[in-house]
């Protein structure tokens, strides 16, 4: 049994492309090897922003010889009245490289037919792999691909070089002028020199020694440790800990080849912002990890993960602090400006937002929601009818705020925050946020009946409206 190592090195690939590409690479390789009737062991993939790697263990070194049966024309068409082979039978035999005298007659469900048995010699795996690997590259699909130079291939980013080793020997693979070799490079800044790959068994160690953590799971663990280390070394606050959001961890893992955490600070004045705003600004825009105290409240700290070791931590931190400060200044301005007008005063302006071309504006939708939610409340909980109608009236008003314009993921959340500022009842403010729940299948659901009733009204309006105009909703996302 043999091993295969295939490395595709590119310019930096967007983080969200990497894991799907690795899954596609593994599935494609397994499918193609099975089609070639080659047995194999584990199929492993590794990826960083600059490389996608396939390793196949225990790969069969040669196809087995096999006998292949080919069924041709019927017996009636294969012999004339004198019992001699017809041109059709002779042509069939020759097309299979067989002497016509070796044709056999076999019984099939459709009757008697001519058949030839072909002895097929198995090919060496090394001879089959070049075409297989080239097809893998050409068939990889990304959310967005690009072309470069005058090549016909499309890929997530331009391919810089390829390495393909089968049992330590270089495979003659060529894709658009890029030839496979046995050389690779380490980290772009920390170990840019070329080095020779020896094989799959040493691949991860070879890269690790050159400041590239190719295994995403190992790199993810390193990100966690680096973020925790950075907080420990800089915070000066007992019990301080980073908020390790799973989605952000996945993203940051695929943004770096060698993670290094840097802890920075921001002005405490920004803590007056709603926690969700601070966290969203750090997480979505800057890919920073927020830091909380032992009581769970946010601290004026954050952690950035760099893609290289840092000699001057204070200089690196100040750069991140400067960028974040600009974001938070904008957020604070939006927050203060938004609160100058009550949500209720914004509702008429929903006329300026199109919900769906054939279904009208968000104001029209809001008015339908008020009627639907009121009907549901009258049927299920009459004592909540007026509160339900109030929630439905205000539910979409925060779409007109600058904060939601900057951070769309905060819709509903900012509605709750601003409703409380406007002295709306707490249960109404809570329901404004909850009416969007669940965001996805299996997600959190409304805890209050108010939120549930308005949420149902919102979805009913969308579903019925879509069916009415002939736009059948799909199951890709909750309506």
Question: Which residues are covered by each model-predicted region?
Answer:
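Amphipathic alpha-helical "coupling" segments that flank catalytic cores
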Residues: 1-479
């Amino acid at each position: 049994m043999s091993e295969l190592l295939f490395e595709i090195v590119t310019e930096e690939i967007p983080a969200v492309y990497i894991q799907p590409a690795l899954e596609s690479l593994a599935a494609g390789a397994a499918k193609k090897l099975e089609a070639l009737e080659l047995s194999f062991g584990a199929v492993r993939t590794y990826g960083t922003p600059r490389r996608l790697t396939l390793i196949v263990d225990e790969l069969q070194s040669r196809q087995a010889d096999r006998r292949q049966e080919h069924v041709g024309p019927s017996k009636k068409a294969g012999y004339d009245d004198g019992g001699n082979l017809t041109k059709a039978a002779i042509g069939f035999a020759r097309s299979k490289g067989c002497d016509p005298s070796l044709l056999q007659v076999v019984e099939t469900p459709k009757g008697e037919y001519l058949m030839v048995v072909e002895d097929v010699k198995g090919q060496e795996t090394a001879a089959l792999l070049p075409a297989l690997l080239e097809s893998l590259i050409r068939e990889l699909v990304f959310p967005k691909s690009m072309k470069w130079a005058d090549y016909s291939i499309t890929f997530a980013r331009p391919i810089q070089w390829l390495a393909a080793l089968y049992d330590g020997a270089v495979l003659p693979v060529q894709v658009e002028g890029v030839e496979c070799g046995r050389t690779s490079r380490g980290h772009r800044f920390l170990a840019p020199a070329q080095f020779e790959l020896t094989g799959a068994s040493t691949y991860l160690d070879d890269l690790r020694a050159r400041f590239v953590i190719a295994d995403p799971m190992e790199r993810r663990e390193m990100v966690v440790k680096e973020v925790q280390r950075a907080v420990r070394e800089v915070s000066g606050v007992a019990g301080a800990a980073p908020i390790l959001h799973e989605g952000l961890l996945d993203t940051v893992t695929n943004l770096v080849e060698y993670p290094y955490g840097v802890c920075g600070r921001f002005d405490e004045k920004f803590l007056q912002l709603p926690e969700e705003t601070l966290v969203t600004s750090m997480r979505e825009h800057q890919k920073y990890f927020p830091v909380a105290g032992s009581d769970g409240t946010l601290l004026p700290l954050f952690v950035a993960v760099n893609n290289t070791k840092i000699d001057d931590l204070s200089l690196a931190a100040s750069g991140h602090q400067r960028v974040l400060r600009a974001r938070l200044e904008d957020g604070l301005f939006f927050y203060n400006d938004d609160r100058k007008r009550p949500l209720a005063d914004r509702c008429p302006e929903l006329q300026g937002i199109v919900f769906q071309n054939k279904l009208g504006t968000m104001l029209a939708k809001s008015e339908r929601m008020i009627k639907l939610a009121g009907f549901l409340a009258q049927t299920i909980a009459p004592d909540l009818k007026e509160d339900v109608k109030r929630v439905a009236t205000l539910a979409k008003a925060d779409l007109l705020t600058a904060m939601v314009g900057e951070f769309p993921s905060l819709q509903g959340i900012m509605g709750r925050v601003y409703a409380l500022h406007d002295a709306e009842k707490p249960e109404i403010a809570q329901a404004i946020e909850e009416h969007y729940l669940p965001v996805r299948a299996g997600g959190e659901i409304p805890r209050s009946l108010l939120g549930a009733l308005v949420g149902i009204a919102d979805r009913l309006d969308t579903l019925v409206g879509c069916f009415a105009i002939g736009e059948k909703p799909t199951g890709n996302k909750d309506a």
